[in-house]
């Protein structure tokens, strides 16, 4: 587990794959011997969120001490930049590698390119769907807007660890690798890159499933609670004509009761004593 006081350069020495993640978080190199916390604060990246992603992708640690500490804007920046990296750089890069390693007149080479292009289209379509639908929905939640009937769980089951097209592609390359040295070496290197990118994509999907989606679920819950609070407050105000007015704290207690909280939970939520909650409830009963 990496901590805020660990040196950033130590993380990179332990796992050079972190270099791409740094770019997606918007962290530039040249940070000397500064700690993770120092680098994140200087480059305006949320430290807790950065370490949550790093500890998950490097150490496989999916335990989140406190989902409420996650910065959803930081996660959105990371995911968007990761998509741009994969669509604009990695997919075209591997395609060029395949083109250089294959004989364009060979029928098997044409099949390999066809399978790769289908895979690339599928991945791009999925990522563009997230860009057009999921991320704007999350931004609306951040702004306190209730965005229609869409919920994050509708999207959370869409990931698969490996595309069928990519599996077929790897199988063909492995089975029918050309015998001449140059093309064999080129295609072997490309196959290695394909495996690396497949692993990267699987980790990316897991970050969405285990870190991003729980953070968005919490946003949804807060949004629903705020909506309920507003409706109840409005209802209370309308029903108080000619009666003794309820205090703001008493209104808070009513909202908490409607949400199903116990006296103890209300006390913790409002930072007051349980006896105070009971007193408020008696006053509410008298006034209403």
Q: What is the predicted role of each segment?
A:
Residues 1-233:
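Small-residue-biased structural context
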Residues 230-276:
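Helix-turn-helix DNA-binding segment
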Residues 280-283:
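Residues within the DNA-recognition helix of helix-turn-helix
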Residues 286-288:
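Short, Lys/Arg-enriched C-terminal cap helix and immediately downstream tail that follows
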């Amino acid at each position: 587990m990496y901590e805020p006081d660990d040196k950033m350069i130590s993380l990179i020495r332990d796992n050079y794959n972190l270099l791409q993640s740094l770019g997606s978080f918007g962290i530039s190199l040249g940070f000397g011997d500064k700690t993770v916390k120092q680098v994140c604060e200087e480059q305006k990246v949320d430290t807790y969120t950065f370490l949550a992603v790093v500890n998950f992708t490097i150490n496989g640690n999916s335990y989140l001490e406190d989902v409420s500490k996650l910065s959803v804007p930081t996660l959105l920046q990371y995911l968007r930049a990761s998509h741009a990296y994969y669509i604009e750089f990695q997919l075209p890069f591997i395609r060029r590698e395949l083109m250089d390693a294959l004989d364009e007149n060979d029928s098997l080479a044409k099949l390999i390119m066809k399978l790769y292009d289908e895979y690339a289209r599928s991945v791009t379509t999925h990522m563009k769907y997230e860009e057009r639908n999921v991320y704007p929905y999350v931004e609306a939640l951040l702004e306190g807007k209730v965005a229609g009937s869409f919920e994050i769980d509708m999207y959370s089951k869409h990931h698969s660890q490996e595309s069928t097209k990519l599996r077929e592609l790897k199988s063909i390359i492995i089975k029918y690798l050309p015998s001449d040295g140059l093309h064999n070496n080129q295609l072997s290197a490309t196959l290695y890159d394909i495996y690396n990118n497949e692993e990267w994509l699987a980790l990316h999907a897991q970050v969405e499933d285990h870190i991003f989606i729980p953070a968005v679920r919490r946003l949804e819950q807060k949004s629903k609670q705020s909506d309920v609070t507003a409706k109840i407050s409005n209802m209370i105000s309308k029903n108080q004509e000619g009666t003794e007015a309820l205090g703001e704290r008493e209104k808070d207690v009513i909202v908490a009761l409607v949400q199903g909280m116990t006296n103890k939970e209300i006390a913790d939520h409002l930072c007051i004593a349980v006896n105070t909650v009971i007193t408020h409830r008696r006053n509410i009963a008298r006034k209403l």
